Amino acid sequence: MSEDRQGRSGDSNKILYCSFCGKSQHEVRKLIAGPSVFICDECVELCNDIIREELEEKAQSARSSLPKPREILEVLDQYVIGQLRAKRTLAVAVYNHYKRIESRSKNDDVELAKSNILLVGPTGSGKTLLAETLARLLNVPFTIADATTLTEAGYVGEDVENIIQKLLQKCDYDVEKAQQGIVYIDEIDKISRKSENPSITRDVSGEGVQQALLKLIEGTVASVPPQGGRKHPQQEFLQVDTKNILFICGGAFAGLDKVIQQRSNDAGGIGFGAKVKSSERKQEVGKILAEVEPEDLIKFGLIPEFVGRLPVVATLEELDEPALIKILTEPKNAITKQFKKLFDMEGVELEFRPDALSAIAKKALKRKTGARGLRTIVESVLLDTMYELPSQENVSKVVVDESVIEHKSEPYLIYQAQPAPAKAASGD
């Protein structure tokens, strides 16, 4: 009976029925055949509706959980000191990016363009930390790529699709999650074109990498080998659409301030209308970088097409001594708080005197390492103490002052007061 009802694909006289709703081929417009199974067009439409409803529910829950720009800024303030303008720019750009993803799920007439971000600022000013904090807040996969290791496909080095493989690794090869992740490409200024004139020799780690990154950043379907695999012809690839991945590129762009100043001076003209150049009134690098225009980035060595793919530009200021002292003490994961917790696990209190914090900040400024160099300085002055402390008894407090930082003196150890020994009872 069931055989008569389903029909045989080889017998043209048998009436075929949908395996899901039971309607015959005469009651529906289309009947699609599978391996001994049939499905009608009405059931296909019903399945589409169910999937569409589920996707809409997911989009609505994501919409309600997406933090507003003000909320994003509040979280960034907990981890990153200063850089208010850059944080506001990022908060708005990230919010708009994920709103754009939501709008793509609807049948909207207006298609929103993708707004990738370029962070310009000195070493240790907080570019990577900003990107990491954003990804943690939004609970999306995040990976960091070093632009200096990238080369064009076919040359020794990493090709640009390795970036997507790293992102997949962060989310256990869940393609759907990876397609809404964040990629931070560091040292992007190091792949600038070596000169404004085209070279006869191929620039495989400069302009060539910029060309290779264009499609990836704009949005393409990247073929990535599965877990731990290498590319070879007989292999099945994972297809990852990058159109919803947010790319944040960062770099120090050393010398860009001079390019901007040159443009400003050229705009001033010559003669009576010219702007007066004064060496005494030297602007801070951060303020100069804030005036960056796309033409400055092109003159620096980024190709016009690449600059066009990074429409949101946020500039970060060089950190001064007060800002570095705040970084040492104020953020949720401040360096001094981390070391205090380590010492507390040994039952010892750790104290940094104000003059010590100032000395650490001055040392980092002298080394031109920004906030990145703070931890190195603190690690080096506390290394011997952290080595000896677990073997010592009765230490209650360790004090770090300016002499420990400047003259490499040993930190002060304060010991617990020992109870006086009980007197022996005298015999009568």
Curated annotation (Swiss-Prot):
Please list the residues that bind Zn(2+): 18, 21, 40, 43
A GO BP term here is: cell division
Domain of life (superkingdom):
Bacteria
Name the keywords, alphabetized: ATP-binding, Chaperone, Metal-binding, Nucleotide-binding, Zinc
Q: Which SMART domains match?
A: AAA (SM00382), ClpB_D2-small (SM01086), zf-C4_ClpX (SM00994)
Where is ATP annotated to bind? 122-129
GO MF annotation: an example: zinc ion binding
What residues does the ClpX-type ZB domain cover? 6-59
Among the Pfam families in the record, one is: zf-C4_ClpX
Keyword Transcription regulation part of the UniProt annotation: no
Bilayer-crossing residues are: none
Looking up PROSITE patterns in the UniProt record yields:
CLPX_ZB
Q: Which InterPro entries match?
A: AAA+_ATPase, ATP-dep_Clp_protease_ClpX, ATPase_AAA_core, Clp_ATPase_C, Clp_protease_ATP-bd_su_ClpX, ClpX_bact, P-loop_NTPase, Znf_CppX_C4
One of the record's GO cellular component terms: HslUV protease complex
Q: How does it assemble?
A: Component of the ClpX-ClpP complex. Forms a hexameric ring that, in the presence of ATP, binds to fourteen ClpP subunits assembled into a disk-like structure with a central cavity, resembling the structure of eukaryotic proteasomes.
- HAMAP family recorded: ClpX
Q: What does this protein do?
A: ATP-dependent specificity component of the Clp protease. It directs the protease to specific substrates. Can perform chaperone functions in the absence of ClpP.
* Protein family membership: Belongs to the ClpX chaperone family.
Q: Can you name this protein?
A: ATP-dependent Clp protease ATP-binding subunit ClpX
- UniProt source species: Xanthomonas euvesicatoria pv. vesicatoria (strain 85-10) (Xanthomonas campestris pv. vesicatoria)
